[in-house]
Amino acid sequence: MSRPVVTLAKGKERTLGRRHPWIFSGALTRVEAELLDGEVVDVHTSRGEFVAIGHYNRASIAVRVLSWQQRAIDHSFWRERLGEARALRTTLALPGTETNAYRLICGEGDQLPGLIVDVYGSVAVFQAHAPGMLRSAQAIAEAIVETVPEVTAVIDRSKDTESAGWLVGSGEGEGVILEHGHSFRVNWQRGQKTGF
């Protein structure tokens, strides 16, 4: 597995030892030239030891950590992370007979920094807040419909996309959801944030 490497400045490993999912640009001493925003990189200590894998960005938050272990960031990775999030929501009885709208992915809390995914019945709304997640949109959308049985369509509502578009499936721009037995009309194409 050969990926570009970014190197931490001496002494900056401590923060990552506490599993903080962000690496700020000031913590890096060396970045391989010509890295694209959103590219998957390995993070190494100043001694050359592997620490993490993440999405690189030429912004203040230079790396958003995806994994603390050496592994491929591929379809099985996205399925695994989404499956873990789905399993956690299932323990909270989501979805249920009185609620079919919930947040499936809440960024760093679900070990997917820079990503929000809300489920509204059979539609999932994808919202990337980091270039790496936007670059991975199609793979993530495909993994969503594979791991969340009720979802048949995924729409992209990321801030950095020109217009909302369907990543998987298609549908109307709005629908009715249930939250604690109450019905709400949600417009996931023009509504605020992800629609609700």
Explain the meaning of each model-derived region.
Residues 49, 58, 132-134, 192-193:
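Short, surface-exposed beta-strand-loop junctions and turns on beta-sheet-rich folds
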Residues 74-81, 132-140:
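Short amphipathic alpha-helical segments
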Residues 1-121, 171-174:
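Non-catalytic accessory regions of SAM-dependent methyltransferases
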Residues 45, 55, 129, 188-189:
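Short clusters of small/polar residues that mark proteolytic maturation junctions
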Residues 121-134:
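A short interface-forming secondary-structure element
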Residues 105-118, 134-196:
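Non-catalytic substrate-recognition/targeting regions of SAM-dependent transferases
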